[in-house]
């Protein structure tokens, strides 16, 4: 089981957004991933270094590159909050 995968919930541990939860939307390469807060918190869709993320055990079923509406729907269906 890879620690950083599409759909994995993670906490940002570095930078001004530290402490915010995000969802991994795409794995760019071994060092960077695309994350989003899906409009549920102030984290916009952006590229992040995997060293700045701490993965959580929760995961939602989304497709690679899913838009924010699909991520938000998957989070609501799974009963997971990003706040």
UniProtKB/Swiss-Prot annotation:
Keywords of the record: Ribonucleoprotein, Ribosomal protein
Organism of this sequence: Thermococcus onnurineus (strain NA1)
Protein name: Large ribosomal subunit protein eL14
GO biological process, one term: translation
Alphabetical list of Gene3D superfamilies matching this protein: 2.30.30.30
Domain of life: Archaea
UniProt-recorded Gene Ontology molecular function terms: RNA binding; structural constituent of ribosome
Family: Belongs to the eukaryotic ribosomal protein eL14 family.
Transmembrane segments: none
Any one Gene Ontology cellular component term annotated for this protein: cytosolic large ribosomal subunit
Ribonucleoprotein keyword on record: yes
PANTHER family per record: 60S RIBOSOMAL PROTEIN L14, LARGE RIBOSOMAL SUBUNIT PROTEIN EL14
Pfam families: KOW
